[in-house]
């Protein structure tokens, strides 16, 4: 299973990263990571767009869900049944917004291996015939940071931008909205950015750079879809 995952995901992404490193002027692995991130986000754009629209729809109907919960507050079984009937009547899948996360998880796992190999230069035997081996890899991002090592600035940026993204989504909630989902969302808005920052602080800065760029892309996409809606 590990070999299959390597062949279908890790190896192609590694080759794409090295190809970008070879063709982008300056041979800066940071620029190659940014370019790879943008390509991945464009590839996943349709699924993220669908997810954001689903989240927006769920937030728009939050007052009606709160009303159902208040109506059946003393009968949890009736409350659950009424909510499910409401979802079915309005053709809503409450789990559809989780799809991009499920898609992104294996990509993140693969990218972890890609960046470890790429940043260390341990790429021999994994390159396709049409991708030249650059030899040594320049891991200094514009000469300012070594992406092969953890970097606290990138870790803080990764957590900070994720907080901004979460805050943008929460700001659409109705003032005073209650309910378990709303309470959990508020808790996750603070917990996940902190967790992201801690993880990023322990990993090579190249992975944190990926997370910064992909989150910035998501913020722009989220702003566009919410304003358009």
Question: Over which residues does each language-model region extend?
Answer:
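Helix-loop-helix
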Residues: 1-229
């Amino acid at each position: 299973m590990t070999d299959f995952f390597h062949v279908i995901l890790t190896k192609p992404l590694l080759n794409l990263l090295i190809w970008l490193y070879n063709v982008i002027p300056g041979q800066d692995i940071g620029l190659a990571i940014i370019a790879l991130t943008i390509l991945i986000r464009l590839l996943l754009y349709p699924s993220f767009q669908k997810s954001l629209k689903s989240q927006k729809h769920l937030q728009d109907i939050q007052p009606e869900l709160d009303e159902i919960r208040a109506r059946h507050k003393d009968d949890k079984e009736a409350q659950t049944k009424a909510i499910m009937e409401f979802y079915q009547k309005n053709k809503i899948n409450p789990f559809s917004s989780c799809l991009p996360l499920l898609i992104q998880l294996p990509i993140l796992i693969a990218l972890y291996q890609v960046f470890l190999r790429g940043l260390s230069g341990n790429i021999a035997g994994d390159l396709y015939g049409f991708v030249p081996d650059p030899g040594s890899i320049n891991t200094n991002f514009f000469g300012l940071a070594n992406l092969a090592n953890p970097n606290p600035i990138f870790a803080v940026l990764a957590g900070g931008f994720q907080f901004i993204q979460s805050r943008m989504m929460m700001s659409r909630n109705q003032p005073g909205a209650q309910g378990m989902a709303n309470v959990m969302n508020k808790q996750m808005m603070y917990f996940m950015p902190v967790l992201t920052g801690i993880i990023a602080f322990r990993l090579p800065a190249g992975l944190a750079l990926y997370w910064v760029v992909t989150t910035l892309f998501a913020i722009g996409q989220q702003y566009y879809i919410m304003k358009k809606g």
